[in-house]
Amino acid sequence: MSIDDLKLPSNVIDIIKNRGIKKLNPPQTEAVKKGLLDGNRLLLTSPTGSGKTLIAEMGIISFLLKNGGKAIYVTPLRALTNEKYLTFKDWESIGFKVAMTSGDYDTDDAWLKNYDIIITTYEKLDSLWRHRPDWLNEANYFVLDELHYLNDPERGPVVESVTIRAKRRNLLALSATISNYKQIAKWLGAEPVATNWRPVPLMEGVMYPERKKKEYTILFRDNTARKVHGDDAIIAYTLDSLSKNGQVLVFRNSRKMAESTALKIANYMNFVSLDEKAISEILKQLDDIEEGGSDEKELLKSLISKGVAYHHAGLSKALRDIIEESFRKRKIKVIVATPTLAAGVNLPARTVIIGDIYRFNRKIVGYYDEIPVMEYKQMSGRAGRPGFDQIGESIIVVRDKEDVDRVFKKYILSDVEPIESKLGSERAFYTFLLGILSAEGSLSEKQLEAFAYESLLAKSVVDVYFDRAIRWLSEHSFIREENNTFTLTNFGKRVADLYINPFTADIIRKGLEGYKASCEIAYLHLLAFTPDGPLVSVGRNEEEELIELLEDLECELLVEEPYEEDEYSLYLNALKVALIMKDWIDEVDEDTILGKYNIGSGDLRNIVETMDWLTYSAYHLSKELRLDDHSDKLRILNLRVTDGVKEELLELVQIGGVGRKRARLLYNNGIKGLGDVVMNPDRVRNLLGQKLGERVVQEAARLLNRFH
């Protein structure tokens, strides 16, 4: 279908044409035929890179032009939110105001009342509904992106909760290919539009070693075969693809494997032609950013100089952004990543090599599970870059020829797993009901039950969980019942607004009410022990050290030592997190923290963000519970966690551009507060440099005026 044939105003057509798009592709054409531009409710399922974002844009713009109101585009990841925001900014040229919001769950974001198109995450939208802002009533068109996240064990409950509310209004749902799309479409009250079309044809295959040393065969889906030679299967196929001027994405099942594989590949990159000027610019970018440990930067620099990088959640966001952008611009030729990359931003390559189909099982030591088919489809879907590649290749590496048939049948020839509700646990279901009551204000038992029946859970499962949830939430003072109507207690409403799990809130309340004011390590351990606390890897040797440390702590912990093995593992995990955070707030150098606890800079950032949220929540819960001894300490602790400083630097880190290192530099040179900054501008400029120093002096003066 030609763009000119669309029933859209000429200025809308022009924006699409300015992107170089003259014709709609098959999924886009099918969506238009099914009434996309008439506001029809649709569920579109198609592979990665098949143009779903343009479908959403056309649906939103057409709907808003006809009906007014607001459109909300929801994604499962912050990185995707940013990506979609940049795309939708194009529509500001014809008068639509576009905004993006994520994080900071304890706010109603009143500023969004002035915007027409809002890009956000599922968690953020869920939290906004709990705050009941008036502007959200104007939202009458929802795009639910990556709806297959309903099947994600961690994110699924929130995605389902948001979907239950959103499907009461106008809706466009977008998803990767799912096997039970007709069932999901019926649940949404939407018409299904299912297609397997891809912009670049995909060749899928399995690679196995021959008896002949250093020889590997790749058997493709169309029964063709190819042989490659080399010291290692992954390296051999990577070099084969690079020799044809392709880029390569290699997926490994752990961070260590990603890093070691990248190092191995780098040793073979001498024959690959690189843009040395571009590589130098990338290396300079790495030097310029403050985020990230020096060791990981040096390792990345040595790899990038050879056209290779690794990518995993342990890296800081700034480092990941540089790697992704350099790969998009074809400056980096190979990325070795963990599967988190496949679930995130769009980063296609000619060749995708899946080095492992097994994942470490966190619950059973030494046990590995095979990856879900959906995870394979997400990884293989990155193969083939539109505009650069005529074909994409996705290869699974197996250790033995005998595995080929089984792997072919399970991953290449099979449908993905059907989507099923992830609300079927006490933690998820209780949180869901709390969120619904917070958003609605008050509901009768039948009304509340009706929301639960709108989930994907079987009615029999809802019946089991509903009574149990109501009883637990009532007994623990989250909800109250009067005249057969349920409302939240003040405590329950505060918990819902803070966007923490009710089980987390209950653990915090018991910990604070059971003890008098305590020390930092005890507060940090309590919060890390909750269901919302961050998880870190604790090795066998570390366990022994942590057990010894328990006997030498400066104060009594606020959580009793558990007897069950699983609970005790979480108890030690919480202690490791608490120790990391104690070093952080005591201004221990970041490189030292990363090395001491064997974590990456991205891990540290995630731990800090989570503990920032939990210390903030604990402070506000202590205020709600009138536990003044605790609240004073928790307020200071939260501020210190936010910036990673001792209490004496809290005034200085309020100044924009002054982080923990610069604040310490100023303090150690006699600049101990805002007044000192304003009274000693020359000394500040000498310490921080003329440009930054001047900005800091002006900002300090502004803050002083505001306080007085």
UniProtKB/Swiss-Prot annotation:
Renumbered ranges of motif DEAH box: 145-148
Classification via Pfam families: DEAD, Helicase_C, Helicase_dom4_arc
EC number(s) recorded for this UniProt protein: 5.6.2.4
Protein's GO biological process: DNA repair
Residue ranges occupied by any Helicase ATP-binding domain in the UniProt entry: 33-196
Alphabetized GO MF terms: 3'-5' DNA helicase activity; ATP binding; ATP hydrolysis activity; DNA binding
Keyword Signal (UniProt): no
Catalytic activity annotation: Couples ATP hydrolysis with the unwinding of duplex DNA by translocating in the 3'-5' direction; ATP + H2O = ADP + phosphate + H(+)
InterPro entries: DEAD/DEAH_box_helicase_dom (IPR011545), Hel308-like_dom4 (IPR048772), Hel308_helicase (IPR053416), Hel308_SKI2-like (IPR050474), Helicase_ATP-bd (IPR014001), Helicase_C-like (IPR001650), Helicase_Hel308 (IPR022965), P-loop_NTPase (IPR027417)
Residue window of motif Q motif: 1-29
Domain of life: Archaea
Keywords: ATP-binding, DNA damage, DNA repair, DNA-binding, Helicase, Hydrolase, Isomerase, Nucleotide-binding
Record carries keyword Lipoprotein: no
Annotated residues for binding of ATP: Q28, S46, P47, T48, G49, S50, G51, K52, T53
PROSITE patterns reported for this sequence: HELICASE_ATP_BIND_1, HELICASE_CTER, Q_MOTIF
Family recorded in the similarity comment: Belongs to the helicase family. Hel308 subfamily.
The protein's role, per its UniProt record: DNA-dependent ATPase and 3'-5' DNA helicase that may be involved in repair of stalled replication forks.
Subunit note: Monomer.
Protein name, UniProt field: ATP-dependent DNA helicase Hel308
Organism: Saccharolobus solfataricus (strain ATCC 35092 / DSM 1617 / JCM 11322 / P2)
